[in-house]
Amino acid sequence: MEHIEYEERVMISENDYKKVIDDLTNSGYKLEPFTIENIYFDNKDFYIDRNGMMLRIRNTSTGIHELTLKVRQSEGVLEINETVENHPQIDKCLDNKLLEFKPIITLKTTRIEIPIENYLLVIDKNEYLDVTDYDIEIEAETQQRAKEVMLELCKKYKLQYDSNYKVKSARAFERFKKGWR
């Protein structure tokens, strides 16, 4: 499946994370966190990352895996997904190093998704390498709508909007490249 994603994101502190969750709970939203494990791939020269792309396998507890390639566009991100059921060849391929692209980083996300009107509010707690960070994401039908909603949320919760936001995979790769071991 292929589609263009229109998203805006903002990094938040742990205190802001708790504040937003408390406010949404008190406003009557039923929050149901779930865990996602993303395994990001690249080669030794970081070809995928250097060319504005991201390749991952997202594991779920249901035995279904989603292979995703994201490619930056002038507006939005082209996302190509393929669902793969649990199959021993996946692990064999990774374990036997049959691919030029290797698993580089595993990132665990505890996610809350709330559909609101004509957008999706996503609240994430991310854990990778020795880092725990938090972010809020808005997915909407256009980039402009995503930004409008994000700016409204930032105003409501007194959050700092940064147009140079780095996605979690970029933050993890940056940390890895700085010599984390």
Locations of the language-model features?
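Phosphate-end processing signature that detects enzymes handling 5′-triphosphorylated RNA
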Residues: M1-R181
